[in-house]
Amino acid sequence: MVDIEAVRAKYREERDKRVQADGGRQYLSAQGEFAHYADDPHAKPIERAPVSDEVDVTIIGAGIGGLLLGARLREACAFDTIRLVDKAGDVGGTWYWNRFPGLRCDVESYVYMPLLEELGRLPSEKYATGAEIFEHCQAIARTYDLYDEALLQTSVTELSWDEDSSRWLVRTDRGDLVRSRFVAMAIGSLHRPKLPSIPGTEAFQGHSFHTSRWDFAYTGGDISGGLEKLGDKRVGIVGTGATAVQCIPHLAESAAHLYVFQRTPSTVSVRNNRPTDPGWAAGLEPGWQQRRMDNFHALTSGVDQDVDLVQDGWTEITSKLAAILPKSAADADPKDIGTAVELADFHKMEELRKRVDAIVHDKDTADALKPYYRLFCKRPCFHDGYLDTYNRPNVTLVDTQGRGVERLTPTSVVAGGREYPVDCLIFASGYESEFGVPYTNRTGFSIVGRDGIRLSEKWAEGARTFHGLQVNGFPNCFILSKAQSGLHVNVPYMLNEQSKHVAYILKAVQQRGRQVVEASATGEKEWVETILRLANRNLDFTESCTPGLFNNEGNPRNVAILNSSYGGGSVGFVNILKRWREADDLADLELREG
């Protein structure tokens, strides 16, 4: 019999160790004296003359979201010029920036990598490498002619709406002035690295870099490992999240000694990767990927399906939850359902903690690697070699008891009052969060709509949108983000749904012979009311979680509720968009001549 109160008490104890009053301020942006941590190590700077022209659509962001939107617009609309603008040296977004050793997707490749069927491609493994995903992004850009008009190594500095011409004026750090009928922002959330705010960081004299800007010139090797230049180096890595879980085994194989500085352990389940089966691939029928994506989306959202097409760690979690729920859940007391969910969560977490004991030999190290929180407080990890790494004699886990690193000296890391000399320090500290950093801060540029209103002013108290995609006062402008939209573990799935929806709207605008489309004030108001009505469903859960990305470092109530994702679940959100399109009346949108 599980003592649920004892479990809750243990989780609270571990959470309280880690809560800091300054919340998200315990991190630094890669700006000012730390700007070099965000430099592009993958491309040589290019020189070009400023561009001054007019295009149909400007998409800011050339990651998976921008590529999907460009592809869906090519399929649906008669646009001559679709322009991608990105500060990176190529398309790919997070898969351009992140090239650390061991990098793979943690969602099955066949549902994660979009447009496989359209391109006639299949990944080589169930969980593809970052290099393969990056190459697939490049293939999307080539297939849909998105390279031709692209402005890469270019950062937007301002978007402003010109009412007289019904055009957006797009200004960049290259001196460009682009007049665009429509603009869309597909900024993403994994492109602005953040650093832990550790005293002495600026004085550290060893080599250091962020995992999203991996320095292979220093480490040697490539994305597959083989970091031969670390053979005589003492290496420290700060962080044990999803990135660190993948690169730590490769660092351990190559470094003279590796120190892993841990605040909070991750859950690490079996990955069970394998090559793509040629026989299975040969039997795929038209529409296979959309069916597989829909199946995975439904199962991982708690919607029962006749068959599990993916059969991975994500869907296994869901099946265990379904097995413990009351059989007549529709008629059950919500409190009983909540308790059943909590028990299912506990049993899964116990299974993961026992896995640590079964693999890690040293008891103290094993105990430090055991996660004590609800499963989805942090993104679950899947890896078949991470835990074994701690059995190596050249690896030391420095568990900071939830407090983090104390300070850096010119030559060492200080944690728990002890000094650890290192030659190289790697920050696996993640990115500026969509949950804790205002959207207009993360874009890095100002957005000025009709009558001179700035998006930063309109969203001062939180986002205000229609379906998370359009904003009243900002005509012909679309935003792909998590705010007031659907949220799911398979991010490209939701980006694809958003992209199809935007493409539908713009095709309808073209078919109706109109030039301008804008969310109505009424439509925006009613959607905001919907967001507010559903926003607090998960607040108690997120508040109980260990500090991290999903709860603003333990302070979820300090995040504007208006920045929440749609509280009715991602399946519900996708169905709302689908029903809206099926009505074919463009409800709550205003169309007019330019």
From Swiss-Prot:
The keyword Zinc does not apply. It is an enzyme of class 1 (oxidoreductase). Keywords: Antibiotic biosynthesis, FAD, Flavoprotein, Monooxygenase, NADP, Oxidoreductase. GO terms for biological process: antibiotic biosynthetic process; lactone biosynthetic process. Disulfide bonds: none annotated. Belongs to the FAD-binding monooxygenase family. S.avermitilis does not produce pentalenolactone itself in vivo but instead a group of new metabolites that are neopentalenolactone derivatives. This is Neopentalenolactone D synthase. It comes from Streptomyces avermitilis (strain ATCC 31267 / DSM 46492 / JCM 5070 / NBRC 14893 / NCIMB 12804 / NRRL 8165 / MA-4680).
